């Protein structure tokens, strides 16, 4: 989960992942979505990029050694507040001013927020379990099967 965006040559990383995967095995990855959400959070987490589903498909479609099983955006219900928070944070350079890691998560105290986020993720998970795809989100989930 959330590894490919940390590698400068993402195609090389995916090719190696595919190479070491056993036949008929499944690969499940998640990556951050949409460069429009780029913020200091990505910088301090050493991300090289954020993706669109089309780009993840292209990474895995470089050879005919497997097939996509399922792909979707997720963290959809959080997209609008995160988009707004990151735009304001970028404009005011808030990420650089925060103490600690500078991560988005440091801007909020744990507690009630964790409970709310947990319930949101459980709700989205129940939808994803039915193989319903979200049209946008903060992250991408991609499932691939090697032939």
Can you name each region flagged by the protein language model?
Residues 39-59, 72-74:
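Acceptor-substrate binding/catalytic loop of class I
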Residues 42, 56, 61, 85-89, ...:
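A generic structural signal for secondary-structure junctions
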Residues 1, 43-44, 68:
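Conserved short-loop catalytic and cofactor-binding motifs
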Residues 65-76:
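Conserved S-adenosyl-L-methionine
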Residues 62-66, 146:
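A structural motif corresponding to the C-terminal end of an alpha-helix
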Residues 78-147:
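A C-terminal cap/extension of S-adenosyl-L-methionine-dependent methyltransferases
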Residues 1-39, 52-57, 142-145:
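Conserved SAM-binding loop
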């Amino acid at each position: 989960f959330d590894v490919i965006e940390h590698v400068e040559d993402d195609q090389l990383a995916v090719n190696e992942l595919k190479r070491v995967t056993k036949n008929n095995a499944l690969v499940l990855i998640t990556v951050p979505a949409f460069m429009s959400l780029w913020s200091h959070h990505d910088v301090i987490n050493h991300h090289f990029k954020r993706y669109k589903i089309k780009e993840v498909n292209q990474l895995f479609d470089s050879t005919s050694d497997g097939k996509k099983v399922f792909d979707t955006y997720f963290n959809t219900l959080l997209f609008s507040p995160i988009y707004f928070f990151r735009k304001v944070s970028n404009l005011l350079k808030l990420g650089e001013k925060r103490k600690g890691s500078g991560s988005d998560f440091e801007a909020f105290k744990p507690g009630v927020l964790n409970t709310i986020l947990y319930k949101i993720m459980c709700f989205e998970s129940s939808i994803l379990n039915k193989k319903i795809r979200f049209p946008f989100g903060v992250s991408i989930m991609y499932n691939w099967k090697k032939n």
